[in-house]
Amino acid sequence: MTNPHADRLIAFLISSGISDQRVLDAIYRLPRESFVSQAMMHQAYDNNALPIGQGQTISQPYIVAKMTELLDLKSDSNVLEIGTGSGYQTAVLAQIVDHVYSVERIKSLQWDAKRRLKQLDIYNVSTKHGDGWLGWEAKGPFDAIIVTAAAESVPQALLSQLKEGGKMIIPVGEEEQQLLKIERQGEQYLSTVVEMVRFVPLVAGDLA
């Protein structure tokens, strides 16, 4: 069954330069309305960030697609997501790789995301309630790390959990941020500015 809203979104993403078919297919298959409140459902397929409670947002689809594409994922990539949020970005990743590890500092958001993923029969995800600044060392090192909140500086713990040749996509800055692509080469980390973005802040610590 076709979804005209999803068709329009995919056409917009392609016109915006997204070309990885796996990313486009993952976004097309996912019912974005399942990740927002009932009051926001009519905007689910718009290219906008939407509030999900607790001062957090679900990122605009273009940013989800762009960040995912930049990771250059393979099916066996070991992936860490910092900031589970609604679980939408998590679900996109889970359709491309065998397993996703995701850390969320707000307990209620973590539980809501787990429930949504289960309802959509997405089981190849492990979530953890914890401090995103610290990553998830026990499950590393990672081929890819995606950070869905803005850090004032790149957390050292996340750099150390990146595999040789691994990539991290992270927004860095205060009000307006640079979206950085960081690649590990030995003990060097090569950083490229992708574009300017706006994300909620990556807050240290966890919240019950």
UniProtKB/Swiss-Prot annotation:
Instruction: Please provide the Gene Ontology terms (biological process) for this protein.
Output: methylation; protein modification process; protein repair
Its primary localisation, in coarse terms, equals: cytoplasm
Localization, per the record, is: Cytoplasm
Keyword entries, A-Z: Cytoplasm, Methyltransferase, S-adenosyl-L-methionine, Transferase
Question: Which EC number applies?
Answer: 2.1.1.77
GO terms for cellular component:
cytoplasm
Could you tell me what reaction this enzyme catalyses? [protein]-L-isoaspartate + S-adenosyl-L-methionine = [protein]-L-isoaspartate alpha-methyl ester + S-adenosyl-L-homocysteine
Q: GO MF terms on file?
A: protein-L-isoaspartate (D-aspartate) O-methyltransferase activity
> Active-site residues?
59
* PROSITE patterns assigned: PCMT
This protein's record includes keyword Membrane: no
- Fetch the HAMAP family from UniProt: PIMT
**Its biological purpose:** Catalyzes the methyl esterification of L-isoaspartyl residues in peptides and proteins that result from spontaneous decomposition of normal L-aspartyl and L-asparaginyl residues. It plays a role in the repair and/or degradation of damaged proteins.
Question: Record's family?
Answer: Belongs to the methyltransferase superfamily. L-isoaspartyl/D-aspartyl protein methyltransferase family.
Protein's UniProt name: Protein-L-isoaspartate O-methyltransferase
Q: What organism, scientifically named, is this protein from? A: Vibrio campbellii (strain ATCC BAA-1116)
